[in-house]
């Protein structure tokens, strides 16, 4: 088996960890929406959020693949009206996040500061089955599995930007330099 190739390399490999699941038998559309919902979250918040989804306390907002998705009041927080609670996708994503957390601990990173920097969900190869129909016909019965990858990076303390001098100060300094 070949080494998994990630679609993105982290900017600081020493301060980041990765996790990847290939050909997972979970619906691509549900998994994509679930992964996009946690992108940019801290690891602790993402795990709490996904556990709340499993308990139906929060929902996953459906933005792209939303045809036929029912409405729920829990989606108002995200600025949309449609949402679901995709159990199987959330469980697989939680297991990948736990794997990434274990990888971070093995690297010696601070788990409390980990942020989900990169998420990618791709369609994996469809698996073919068949269903038998009337009059001796056979129709395909395909599944749409997913390949999911996460890159988590340790958040560094942001350095505050120095206050810029106002335009008036710059102008007065310029006139002083000319007169001097």
From Swiss-Prot:
Keyword Secreted appears in the UniProt entry: no
A Pfam cross-reference name: Ribosomal_L22
A GO term for molecular function: structural constituent of ribosome
Keywords: Ribonucleoprotein, Ribosomal protein
Gene3D superfamilies reported in the protein's UniProt record: Ribosomal protein L22/L17 (3.90.470.10)
Polar residues: bias regions: 8-20
UniProt-annotated stretches for the region Disordered: 1-20, 160-180
Listed InterPro entries: Ribosomal_uL22 (IPR001063), Ribosomal_uL22_euk/arc (IPR005721), Ribosomal_uL22_sf (IPR036394)
Membership in a protein family: Belongs to the universal ribosomal protein uL22 family.
Protein name, entry field: Large ribosomal subunit protein uL22
Protein species of origin: Dictyostelium discoideum (Social amoeba)
């Amino acid at each position: 088996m070949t080494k998994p190739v990630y679609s993105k390399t982290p900017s600081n490999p020493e301060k980041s960890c990765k996790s990847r699941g290939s050909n997972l038998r979970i619906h691509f559309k549900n998994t994509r929406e679930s992964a996009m919902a946690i992108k940019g979250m801290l690891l602790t918040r993402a795990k709490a959020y996904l556990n709340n989804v499993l308990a139906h306390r929060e929902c996953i907002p459906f933005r792209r693949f939303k045809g036929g998705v029912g409405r729920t009041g829990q989606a108002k927080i995200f600025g949309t009206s449609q949402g679901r609670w995709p159990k199987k996708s959330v469980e697989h994503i939680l297991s990948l996040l736990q794997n990434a957390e274990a990888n971070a601990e093995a690297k010696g990173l601070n788990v409390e500061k980990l942020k989900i920097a990169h998420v990618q969900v791709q369609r994996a190869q469809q698996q073919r089955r068949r269903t038998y129909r009337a009059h001796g016909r056979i129709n395909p019965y395909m599944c749409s599995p997913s390949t999911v990858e996460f890159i988590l990076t340790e958040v560094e303390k942001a350095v505050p930007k120095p206050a810029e001098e106002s335009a008036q100060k710059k102008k007065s300094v310029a006139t002083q330099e000319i007169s001097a």
